Design a protein with these regions (language model features):
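Conserved core architecture of multi-subunit DNA-directed RNA polymerases
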Residues: 1-246
């Protein structure tokens, strides 16, 4: 874990070894001394960056049983886009739950043509969707994000794309430059006291600080929809970065 000389890394896999006295312990990790400067330099070279961000934040301690740290590359890229991290490795945004059943395209700052492409072909009266002031019935799986979270998830999407390209050696996925590019992408929503995320689709942005969605959607997260605070994350973030081992 870290080399005496920066740039010299084996690229192999380290298997977990558990001492006898730690086998049945709540925390299996062992205190170690590592060359953090070399770890960061190795990661910088691997990512193809000219320099690492001036300020990076990390957890004081790992809370899982095996206490396995994530790749430092992810922390470097998150810091590049000024993003925080939850203790499971994902990037979340918290909002108060606000039930909604109907909306107009202009209320969520999305053109009717884009909503029609997402399946909103008629308004709540059965008329063909042709303007931004028609009233639509929200689908149970769709989500309207607080406008304050729009830039946050633009930066998150850019982080995910850089992570795919620089760390995983794959093609970018989101190609997001502005908030409207997020419309139609999948998210994962969850309440703090439940163990499963609920799949959803981002369809627009509200001027309030709450997260608007169908009552059934909020109830799926937490069994009710009484205005409590829940979190959402980009689905690709959860698929790539969620870990029970951190």
């Amino acid at each position: 874990f870290g080399e005496s000389k920066a740039g010299e890394i084996c690229g192999g896999r380290t298997e977990l070894r558990i001492s006898n006295e730690k086998e049945d312990s709540r925390r299996r990790g062992e205190l170690q001394t590592v060359r953090l400067d070399n770890l960061l330099e190795d990661a910088r070279i691997s990512l193809g960056l000219d320099r690492v961000p001036k300020q990076m934040k990390g957890l004081k301690k790992l809370t899982s049983r095996n206490q396995t740290p994530e790749a430092v590359h992810k922390g470097i890229l998150r810091a590049k886009f000024n993003l925080p991290v939850f203790r499971d490795g994902t990037i979340r945004f918290d909002m108060s739950d606000v039930p909604v059943t109907h909306f107009t395209p202009e209320e969520i700052h999305v053109d009717w043509q884009q909503l029609k492409h997402l399946g909103y072909t008629t308004d709540c009266f059965g008329n063909e969707l042709k303007s931004n002031d028609q009233m639509l019935e929200i689908f149970p799986q769709d989500f309207i994000l607080a406008k304050s979270g729009a830039d946050y998830f633009v930066r998150t999407a850019k982080y995910i794309d850089e992570l795919l390209v620089r760390f995983y050696g794959m093609k970018p996925y989101y190609h997001v430059d502005e908030p409207k590019d997020l419309v139609g992408h999948l998210i994962c929503a969850l309440a703090p006291h439940t163990s499963g995320g609920v799949l959803s689709r981002l369809i627009g942005f509200s001027d309030s600080s709450g997260g608007y969605a169908h009552p059934l959607f909020h109830a799926a997260k937490r069994r009710n929809c009484d205005g409590d605070e829940d979190a959402i994350m980009l689905l690709m973030d959860g698929l790539l970065n969620f870990s029970r081992e951190i």
